Regions:
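Short aromatic/hydrophobic "clamp" motif used to bind/position activated sugar donors
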Residues: 99
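Active-site-proximal specificity loops/subdomain of glycosyltransferases
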Residues: 53-92
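A glycosyltransferase accessory/donor-loop signature
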Residues: 1-4, 8-10, 17-20, 147-272, ...
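Conserved catalytic-core segment of nucleotide-activated headgroup transferases in glycan assembly
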Residues: 268-313
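Acidic donor-binding loop of glycosyltransferase active sites
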Residues: 336-349
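Conserved active-site histidine-acidic residue motif and adjacent donor-binding/catalytic loop
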Residues: 304-305, 320-334, 350
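Conserved donor-nucleotide/metal-binding helix-loop-beta segment in metal-dependent transferases, i.e.
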Residues: 108-135
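Short hydrophobic beta-strand element within catalytic cores of glycosyltransferases
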Residues: 363-367
């Protein structure tokens, strides 16, 4: 059986992201011929990858590109490298007739073999609609390419001509590709390119339906925009999925161990209990003490803004999880696993959260100087009684282990 052609385009700064994407791809299929368009990846890396991929009847090809003809083209954003234009040369670099181009900021959760069999209805390109940006253009992060069609229509030459003329007016190579193909491309199912990089922006735009528009786990998760999962900020869905494949060893992939069916939590371990704080200030009363004294309690801190450094520096405690500019989906996921709520942020309450906690019938622990509960039960301690609060939380969690299904 012939190998299936896959193409990535990367530079040295993205080598780690490229390898993570390759891990997720190889975890679900073999017999791949992976072409990497690049100008600076070390030859040693290719040698190591080929040694590993050989066991999957796969290989990786070092396709060196000259930057001269690409460096003068405009880039739509500072997180995009001119290597994105390398894909123009795919028909010249790849031998196979059906080609699958993939961005490096993607994770693949299933076998992509069906894309090699899909009927493009006579078109030279298959892609996914660029949701939520447009309803008629496509996102260029995943492309199914008919090499013969591209060669017959001299697509590469046409793309270079269009780029020289329009590169300052359109969104990089994606804009050029859309300009060339217009309506003459085949629309693939949304599952093959779900752009979760848009999560934060859609929330800020007030598009709360965006989170429920796609249900389940897509075949391809695309971390578009600046909001990448490898940054310190938690903005998007499926962030932990990227870290799962990042942490997965090649040995586990090559041996097809059962761990492939597990999750990020299975790799790093799950906390026994969960607490939350919704805040609009980084000055959270006695937070560091609680982090120290309750190491088996994950404390999730959510805010509608970014966090000050006095709070960020507390991330040295592994049980602290920060969610700046949180969205409704993030809030919902935190609340679903909550055991207790810590009403310890001074100043105004956020989103009337204590009312929500009361509706969930969860206990609230507070200090006299931070208490936001006017009516209802809450355990309130003097501002200097943090150890008493710690003892009360421990006692509650111990008494309610079975109730909350905790271990």
């Amino acid at each position: 059986m012939s190998k299936k052609a896959v193409v990535f385009s990367a530079d040295l700064s993205y080598m780690e992201k490229l390898e993570t994407a390759m891990k997720s791809l190889c975890a679900h299929q073999d017999q791949l011929k992976i072409y990497v368009l690049n100008e600076d990846l070390p030859t040693e890396w290719f040698a190591i990858m080929n040694q590993r991929l050989r066991q999957l009847d796969s290989e990786v090809i070092n396709c060196r590109m000259s930057p001269k003809q690409f460096q003068s083209f405009s880039l739509p954003s500072d997180h995009i490298h001119y290597a994105t234009y390398f894909r123009y040369a795919i028909p010249e670099m790849v031998e196979e007739e059906r080609i699958l181009y993939l961005d490096c900021d993607m994770i693949f959760t299933q076998d992509l073999s069906p894309l090699y069999e899909v009927d493009l209805n006579g078109y030279g390109l298959g892609a996914v609609v660029d949701k939520p940006t447009t309803i008629d253009g496509f996102n260029a992060g995943l492309l199914v390419i008919d090499k013969t069609w591209w060669q017959e229509h001299q697509v590469t030459e046409a793309l270079f001509d269009l780029t020289r003329e329009h590169h300052q007016q359109v969104y990089g190579d994606q804009g050029i590709l859309n300009l060339y193909f217009k309506d003459a491309w085949y629309s693939l199912p949304w599952t093959y390119n779900l752009q979760v990089g848009s999560d934060k922006d859609q929330y800020l735009y007030g598009d709360l339906d965006w989170y429920d528009a796609f249900q389940g786990i897509p075949a391809v998760v695309h971390y578009t925009s600046h909001n990448k999962p490898w940054t310190s900020k938690r903005f998007n869905r499926f962030r932990e999925l990227w870290w799962f494949y990042y942490a997965l060893s090649w040995e586990e992939i090559l041996l097809r161990k059962p761990i492939l069916k597990q999750t990020y939590q299975d790799l790093v371990g799950e906390f026994l209990y969960h607490a939350a704080i919704y805040t609009n200030t980084a000055d959270i009363h006695e937070l560091e003490t609680l982090l120290k004294e309750l190491p088996d309690v994950a404390i999730h801190v959510l805010a509608h803004s970014h966090f000050g450094f006095n709070l960020v520096q507390l991330e040295r405690y592994p049980n602290l999880f920060l969610y700046p500019s949180f969205d409704p989906l993030t809030s919902r996921k935190v609340l679903e696993k909550l055991d207790v709520y810590l009403d310890i942020n001074p100043y105004d309450e956020v989103d009337q959260i204590t009312q929500t906690i009361q509706q969930l019938d969860l206990p609230i622990f507070s200090f006299e100087g931070t208490n936001h509960v006017e009516n209802g039960e809450t355990q309130v301690f003097a501002d200097d009684q943090v150890q008493e609060m710690v003892a009360a939380i421990r006692d509650y969690l111990k008494r309610n282990e079975k109730k909350h299904g905790n271990k």
